[in-house]
């Protein structure tokens, strides 16, 4: 699991990362300053951006690092990205709201809690 996107929504995924790692699943945050980073076809990338700014700023450099080889789940409040061809997202989760960072972060926390709980019940119960 690779988490990428805006700094604010990424900060609320720290508990998710910690929990997934404690369950034996690698979960890392992508950092653009890591020049040797390459995405793999076995990666699941969650790209988090409320408005889409983080995506428009990073899309070219991410594609150069092989982003489109991965399975990409885009989570955004910006409805225009639901069918945006240049993203190469496999799935788009339209998070309800209108570019409200606090509301977006709470919904992201809830979505990642559900993913974590689903993973736990599937592999540990």
Where are these regions (language model features)?
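Glycine-rich phosphate-binding loops that contact phosphosugars or nucleotide phosphates
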Residues: 1-124
């Amino acid at each position: 699991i690779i988490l990428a996107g805006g700094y604010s929504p990424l900060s609320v995924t720290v508990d998710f990362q910690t929990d997934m790692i404690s369950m034996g699943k690698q979960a890392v945050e992508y950092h653009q300053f890591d020049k040797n980073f390459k995405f793999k076809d076995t990666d699941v990338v969650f790209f988090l951006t409320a408005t889409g700014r983080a995506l428009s700023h990073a899309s070219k450099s991410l594609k150069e690092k092989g982003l489109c080889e991965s399975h990409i789940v885009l989570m955004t409040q910006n409805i225009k990205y639901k069918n945006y061809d240049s993203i190469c997202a496999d799935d788009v989760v339209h998070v309800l709201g209108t570019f409200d960072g606090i509301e977006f972060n709470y919904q992201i926390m809830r979505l990642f809690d559900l993913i974590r709980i689903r993973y736990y019940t599937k592999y540990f119960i």
